[in-house]
Amino acid sequence: MYDNEAIVGQDVAESGLRREDVFITTKLCQTRAGYELAWQGIEESLARLQTDYIDLLLIHEPYDEALDMYRALTEAYRQGVIRAIGISNFNAREYLDFIGSCDVIPMVNQVECHIYYRRKELQQALVTQGTQIQAWSPFTEGKKPIS
């Protein structure tokens, strides 16, 4: 999605670090929408990252095909290919609608969240259902002072 998986995989391989000491998160975007394409995306990410598992895999946005994508993630999670599965950029309504059809509740919802955009309704929905919030812009992308 961000065209950085190959370099991350190479750097981890060359770093001398043990794989279990590095936490790798990546995402599937719309070009991998749907069940089959999601599986293809998982396999491609594993190859580019030069690893046999991904620590956290997210669906980038609430695409129309997100449930089909998530079904592939769920199967990969059950097989141990992905250690944690989640979503990104789902608001409270989208999240609650989505989890109504999930066998495994997303472990993470990665969203914009910071002092100026606290997402209280979303945070409450996530806490109630057992999903962790992960901020993708905790310091407002440097656009506003936080002191």
Language-model segment annotations:
Residues 1-22, 139-142:
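N-terminal binding-site loop/beta-alpha segment at the start of enzyme catalytic domains
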